[in-house]
Amino acid sequence: DYTALCGITAAWQHPRHLACVIAREIMRVSLAQTGVMIADGSSNLLPIPPHVPAAWKRHFDDVTHSLVNGYYQGWDLHPGHLPTRYAAVYAFYLSALPAATTRLRNFFTKAEKAGAAFDDAATGQALVNFLNRALSSGAITPEEAAQTGLSESELSTGSFLKILTGRSA
């Protein structure tokens, strides 16, 4: 195990340890634009009595930390981790949905007015990706995604620029 090889004692071996964060970020930079997705690490505190509440709390926090930092794939050591992964994924998407919906709707309004000189396509793309991941995970419905003003077919392109180009054609 990586953290053990780094000399980190068992009580502090978890995916949010700085050694793990640095290793993941180095991998992210090294693999940028290759299509390789990095997965979060597992929580080593198993949800078995008497540790169930503490294990679920740690796992929920670990998964949430990974999602907040852009790691959308994960794996778990124990089937008892699945409820907290499910809860963390849904909580992540549902908590960010209102702001993402408003921002994406506003991005398209501003982009359509700006014409060819739109500065922040990367953020628009990140919001399209967010909504597609939320839909794929089941955290939101197509009706909730439609609150952005995008049609299901526009969102399914997965491309902010394709949507923008299609609207200006």
Positions of predicted regions on the chain:
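Expand to "…catalyze enediolate/carbanion chemistry for C-C bond making/breaking, isomerization
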Residues: 1-169
